[in-house]
């Protein structure tokens, strides 16, 4: 689970690095118990490193875990979404707020958005095509709704390279850095108990609440059970149809 840290020096690791592992576990659907065990392991490593004078702080004590099992998974309220939206033009938090809004209006995973290439964005037809490399998730149609159209259009004009949201160096944005900025944005908005994956869950919950057809929701989100029925519902791979369904979604 901590594979991204294997090649790093222990003295260089900070709370954000350990949090990245926890966040990845949450995105994969692992339980709070699994996350607690991973945090305990990180804590033991930090305690050993402190005893060896390698570091001077137990960074594991700063990690945020998902809600306890048995509680309903967290979704953002309309007021919290407005708090995020209001910071889209902020010099410090603007890009992160824009990323959050796109995730809220597409249901994409953060990795999927950061991996999006400009060539896969079709502004005229109002959809993107991408997703994780799974049978149901890869190369799926992701409609672009009006509230995020200008964000996507700006990113396309501003990119200057293959990535839709590149770093200043023209490379793919680092998920760890984005996650760190996301936590800072949540603190700025006084929003607690939220991870990037919460945005996907909020979007999927809103789609269901607003009455989108079940197979359309599955297609847009790339749910694994959609791959077994996709061939029976050819229309659900049609960008115009999926956009029409997504337009039912209102926050």
Region locations from a protein language model:
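Conserved tyrosine-mediated DNA breakage-rejoining catalytic core shared by Y-recombinases
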Residues: 74, 80, 106, 115-154
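DNA/chromatin major-groove-contacting recognition/catalytic segments
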Residues: 87, 140-143, 150, 154, ...
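Hydrophobic (often cysteine-bearing) scaffold residues that line and stabilize catalytic clefts
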Residues: 14, 34-41, 77, 95-96, ...
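C-terminal catalytic core of tyrosine-transesterase DNA break-rejoin enzymes
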Residues: 51, 98-101, 105-112, 181-184, ...
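Basic, Lys/Arg- and aromatic-enriched nucleic-acid-binding interface segment
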Residues: 35-36, 51, 55-110, 114, ...
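Active-site/catalytic core of tyrosine-dependent DNA strand-transfer enzymes
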Residues: 145-191
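Short, polar N-cap/turn motifs at the start of nucleic acid-interacting alpha helices
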Residues: 120-125, 193, 212-232
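Basic/aromatic-enriched alpha-helical hairpins
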Residues: 1-29, 45-47
